C-alpha cells in the first residue's frame, strides 16, 4: 500500500461541484436496501475489528472525532483494527467484509482510548477551529502522533502524552519546507486534501504517511512546490484546491508533475477499506467474444460520477442504480474508477460480483483518476499506468474527458 503509486483514492462522501453553478446531490434516500450479496468463501480469518459510529463520538466542533481518526490511522497502519463510520453505506461494506472473514465488535471512545492510546508517541496540537488539520495530519503520520486540540490535550488521559509539535501558528509554506527537510519520512506517492470535513481521510493519510495540502485556498507557488515533491503521476486524494473549482483544481494538478485527482471528501476508515488483508475479487473475463454487427450504429447510456468515490460508496450501491432489479434488462455502461481495486476493496468486490451480464464497466475520468490529458505533464506514462489498472479490473475501455 505504501509504495504503489498507482493507487487512487479510495474514500465516503458527497462531492459538490461548483463549476458553472452545477451541484450534484444524492438521490434515492427512501429506497429500501438491496438484498445482501451471496457470501464468498472467507479470504481472511479471525480479524476482529472495533466498530464505532460518528454519532457515538465527538462534540460540536468534532475535536474527539479528529482525535479518533488520527488514532485509527496509527493503529490500522500495521493491521486493521478500528472502523469509524457514519452508518448508511458503511454498514453495507461491513456486510461485505464480514463475508470475507471479518468480525466487528462495538466499543466506546473511552474503551478504544484505553486499548490503543499507548500506540501514540505523543500528540500534535491543532487549533480549536481545526483550520490547521492539514498540517497536523501531515506531521502526525511521520511522528506517530495523534491530533489534539488545546481542550482535549488538557484532559486525562490525553494529558499524559508528550506534545511533539504545535501547528496552531503554522501555514502551508511552513509545511512545504518541513516536508522538504524531512522528505525521507514521508510517503510521497500521494497527497491528500479535504476542503470540507477535517476529520475525514485523516486515518488514511496518517496510516500511509501521506502529506496534506491546504484545506483552504492554496498559494499557487506553494502548492506547485508540494506537487513537485511527489513522484510523477501521483494521486491527489480529495477535493478543493487551489480554487475549489473543478477545472482549476484538476487542471492545476495535471499540469504540475502529472498529479491526478481522485475525488472524495467525506471518507472515513479508508485505512480499513484499503487494508492489505482484504483481497480483491476480479470478475472472470467473458469466454466468448460477441461479434460486432455490420451496418449498425452502437450507442449506450453511460452513468457518470464514476470518478467520485463518495458516490461509489453510497449512491451507486442503492437500488436506484446498478443494484436496481431491472438494471439487467437493457445494456448500460457504468463508470468505475479502477483505483477502487486497491483503495476500497469491498466496494470493488461488490461491483465485480454484481455487474449484470448485459452491462459493462469502463474506467472513469480519465483513467486512474480525474485529469485533463491534453494538459497532463507526463501523459504517456500516466496512460501506461492506467492501462495496467484497467486490465486488473477486467476493463477494456475508459472514459476520456478533456
What positions do the PLM features span?
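Intrinsically disordered, low-complexity repeat/linker tracts enriched for polar/charged residues
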Residues: 18-23, 27-29
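Terminal accessory/targeting
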Residues: 14, 32-341
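C-terminal regions of proteins
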Residues: 364-379
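Well-ordered, non-membrane alpha-helical segments in soluble/globular domains
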Residues: 219-220, 311-323, 343-351, 376-389
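Acidic (Asp/Glu)-rich catalytic clusters
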Residues: 291-293, 320-327, 343-366, 389-392
Amino acid at each position: 500500500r505504501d509504495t504503489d503509486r498507482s493507487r487512487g483514492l479510495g474514500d465516503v462522501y458527497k462531492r459538490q461541484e461548483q463549476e458553472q453553478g452545477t451541484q450534484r446531490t444524492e438521490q434515492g434516500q427512501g429506497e429500501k436496501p438491496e438484498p445482501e450479496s451471496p457470501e464468498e468463501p472467507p479470504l481472511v480469518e479471525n480479524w476482529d475489528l472495533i466498530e464505532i459510529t460518528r454519532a457515538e463520538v465527538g462534540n460540536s466542533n468534532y475535536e474527539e472525532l479528529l482525535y479518533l481518526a488520527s488514532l485509527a490511522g496509527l493503529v490500522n497502519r500495521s493491521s486493521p483494527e478500528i472502523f469509524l463510520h457514519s452508518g448508511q453505506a458503511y454498514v453495507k461494506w461491513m456486510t461485505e467484509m464480514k463475508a470475507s472473514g471479518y468480525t466487528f465488535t462495538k466499543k466506546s471512545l473511552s474503551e478504544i482510548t484505553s486499548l490503543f492510546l499507548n500506540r501514540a508517541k505523543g500528540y500534535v496540537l491543532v487549533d480549536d477551529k481545526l483550520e490547521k488539520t492539514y498540517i497536523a495530519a501531515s506531521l502526525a503520520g511521520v511522528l506517530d502522533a495523534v491530533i489534539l486540540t488545546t481542550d482535549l490535550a488538557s484532559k486525562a488521559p490525553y494529558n499524559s502524552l508528550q506534545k511533539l509539535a504545535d501547528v496552531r501558528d503554522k501555514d502551508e509554506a511552513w509545511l512545504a519546507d518541513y516536508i522538504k527537510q524531512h522528505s525521507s519520512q514521508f510517503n510521497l506517492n500521494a497527497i491528500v486534501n479535504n476542503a470540507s470535513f477535517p476529520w475525514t481521510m485523516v486515518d488514511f493519510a496518517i496510516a500511509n504517511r501521506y502529506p496534506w495540502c491546504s484545506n483552504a485556498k492554496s498559494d499557487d507557488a506553494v502548492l506547485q512546490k508540494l506537487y513537485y515533491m511527489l513522484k510523477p503521476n501521483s494521486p491527489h486524494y480529495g477535493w478543493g484546491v487551489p480554487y475549489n473549482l473543478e477545472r482549476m483544481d484538476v487542471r492545476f494538478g495535471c499540469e504540475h508533475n502529472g498529479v491526478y485527482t481522485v475525488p472524495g471528501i467525506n471518507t472515513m476508515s479508508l485505512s480499513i477499506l484499503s487494508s492489505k488483508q482484504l483481497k480483491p475479487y476480479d470478475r472472470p473475463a467473458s469466454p466468448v467474444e460477441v461479434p460486432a454487427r455490420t451496418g449498425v450504429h452502437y450507442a449506450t447510456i453511460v452513468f457518470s460520477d464514476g470518478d467520485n468515490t463518495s458516490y461509489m460508496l453510497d449512491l451507486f450501491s442503492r437500488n436506484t442504480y446498478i443494484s436496481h432489479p431491472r438494471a439487467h434488462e437493457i445494456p448500460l455502461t457504468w463508470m468505475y474508477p479502477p483505483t477502487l481495486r486497491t483503495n476500497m476493496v469491498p466496494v470493488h468486490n461488490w461491483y465485480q460480483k454484481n455487474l449484470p451480464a448485459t452491462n459493462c464497466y469502463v474506467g472513469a475520468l480519465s483513467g486512474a483518476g480525474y485529469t485533463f490529458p491534453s494538459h497532463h505533464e507526463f501523459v504517456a506514462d500516466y496512460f501506461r499506468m492506467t492501462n495496467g489498472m484497467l486490465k486488473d479490473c477486467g476493463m477494456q475501455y475508459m472514459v476520456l474527458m478533456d
